[in-house]
A protein has these predicted regions:
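Intrinsically disordered, low-complexity regulatory segments
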Residues: 1-119, 123
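Conserved small/polar residues in nucleotide/adenosyl-binding loops
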Residues: 3-7, 163-170
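C-terminal or mid-to-C-terminal helical accessory/interaction module adjacent to the motor/catalytic core
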Residues: 91-161, 165-166
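Alpha-helical architecture
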Residues: 54-56, 144, 168
Length: 171
């Protein structure tokens, strides 16, 4: 994103931490195929009288669909299909029970808060750990999900290695 273009943040130093931009925003990925598909979506929503948000039923699905609609500058009413099963009966019931998108605002805000928190943690902790504990020029990537997952994998590897070592010693 544009945050990396900020002159003050180009060099990695402890003095620049914490890195907190004045505002957060969304930006389309700079890839031709994605931009082309988004232009198709943008043209379709420009002429829509109503949109039915059929994104995944959950925080992440709500966030992604809202971001797409924000970037596409959706002006028409939006209703939400909320289903967790793809059976014919479930889909029919879901379309009979569409809700206004405002009913899901708190879910969107929760997802947005998580995304911003992940960014703040990731960029600041990655720079801190890379500068403090890494080798010059090497990045020690830190994140809310990846770091504890890696810790679980390392712990499991150590447990298996220790078990093999103990089994070898008793032979």
């Amino acid at each position: 994103s544009d945050v990396y273009k900020r002159q003050a943040w180009k060099r990695w130093t402890l003095g620049q931490l914490p890195m907190l931009p004045p505002r957060f925003g969304i930006k389309l990925i700079d890839q031709k195929s994605i931009q082309h598909q988004f232009e198709v979506i943008k043209k379709l929503v420009a002429s829509a009288e109503e949109i039915i948000n059929c994104g995944d039923a959950g925080q992440e699905g709500e966030l992604i669909q809202r971001w797409v609609m924000q970037l596409a500058d959706v002006k028409c009413p939006v209703r939400r299909l909320w289903i967790s099963s793809l059976t014919d009966a479930s889909i029919k019931q879901g379309f009979n029970d569409l809700k206004p998108d405002k009913d899901f605002n708190n879910l969107y805000y929760a997802g947005l808060s998580r995304a911003i928190g992940d960014w703040i943690l990731g960029i600041n902790a990655t720079r801190l750990y890379s500068l403090r504990y890494g080798e010059p020029g090497k990045v020690l990537s830190v994140g809310r999900v990846q770091t504890p997952t890696l810790a679980l994998l390392v712990g499991r590897h150590k447990a298996v290695s220790y078990t093999h070592l103990r089994a070898h010693e008793t032979r």
